[in-house]
Amino acid sequence: MEMIVIAVVALTLLALLFGMLLGYASRRFAAEEDPVVDQVDELLPQSQCGQCGYPGCRPYAEAVANNGEQINRCVPGGEPVMQKIATLLNVEPQPLDGDAAMAEPVRMLAVIDEPNCIGCTKCIQACPVDAIVGATRAMHTVMSDLCTGCNLCVDPCPTQCIELRPAATTTDNWKWDLNTIPVRNIPVEQHA
């Protein structure tokens, strides 16, 4: 019994000593994080979709803060995120990356053809924002409020029952198409 007590005390003291050494080393040799990278990363939507050309939001934030990468490449964040990053970095806002259609992007949503869904859960595993709900061997569905339209759930589906479609127009996302309004110059008479 005496040997067990000695062993427990010795191991406790060793664990305490090594814990203190590790604690000291972690503070002494800590690498300082760039606060600008953290701030840019907080502004990004954290969908980890890769549409910007980087494997996730953190690498894109590092490229923007340290390497001067363009601030307009986050498709899910769109113009609001680009404006916030421009304000944070004190740079001029840029037009969104891509063609003219990207300036007013159409919100895309994943839609599951539910009768053809086999419930394999591969789309659930691929979704970075947990917008797909369902269970193994049960029908899955997409929560449209959470879906960012990142397209990461489409390829893993073995039955190709997922596709991206434009979001339905509602009063929340409707915008007036100014190109449909006829513009006429109205002559104004000048009175003396």
Swiss-Prot record:
> What are the UniProt keywords, alphabetically?
4Fe-4S, Cell inner membrane, Cell membrane, Electron transport, Iron, Iron-sulfur, Membrane, Metal-binding, Repeat, Translocase, Transport
Query: At which positions is [4Fe-4S] cluster 1 bound?
Result: C49, C52, C57, C74
UniProt KW Electron transport keyword: yes
First-level EC class: translocase
Under Enzyme Commission nomenclature, its number is 7.-.-.-
Which residues make up the binding site for [4Fe-4S] cluster 3? C127, C147, C150, C153
Q: Which cofactor does it need?
A: [4Fe-4S] cluster
Q: Where is the 4Fe-4S ferredoxin-type domain?
A: 108-137, 138-167
| Subcellular location field | Cell inner membrane
Residues noted as binding [4Fe-4S] cluster 2 in the record, renumbered to the chain: C117, C120, C123, C157
| Primary location | membrane
The cofactor binding remark recorded in the entry reads: Binds 3 [4Fe-4S] clusters.
GO MF term list: 4 iron, 4 sulfur cluster binding; electron transfer activity; metal ion binding
The residues covered by the 4Fe-4S domain are 32-91
Could you tell me which residues belong to the region Hydrophobic?
Answer: 1-26
Q: Cite a GO CC annotation.
A: plasma membrane
| InterPro entries on file | 4Fe-4S_dom, 4Fe4S_Fe-S-bd, 4Fe4S_Fe_S_CS, 4Fe4S_Ferredoxin_RnfB, Elect_transpt_cplx_RnfB/RsxB, RnfB/RsxB_Proteobac
Which GO biological process entries does UniProt record here?
Answer: electron transport chain
| Family classification | Belongs to the 4Fe4S bacterial-type ferredoxin family. RnfB subfamily.
Matches recorded under NCBIfam families: PRK05113.1, rnfB
Q: How does it assemble?
A: The complex is composed of six subunits: RnfA, RnfB, RnfC, RnfD, RnfE and RnfG.
Biological role stated in the UniProt entry:
Part of a membrane-bound complex that couples electron transfer with translocation of ions across the membrane.
Any idea what this protein is called? Ion-translocating oxidoreductase complex subunit B
- What is the species listed in this Swiss-Prot or TrEMBL entry? Cronobacter sakazakii (strain ATCC BAA-894) (Enterobacter sakazakii)
Its gene name is rnfB
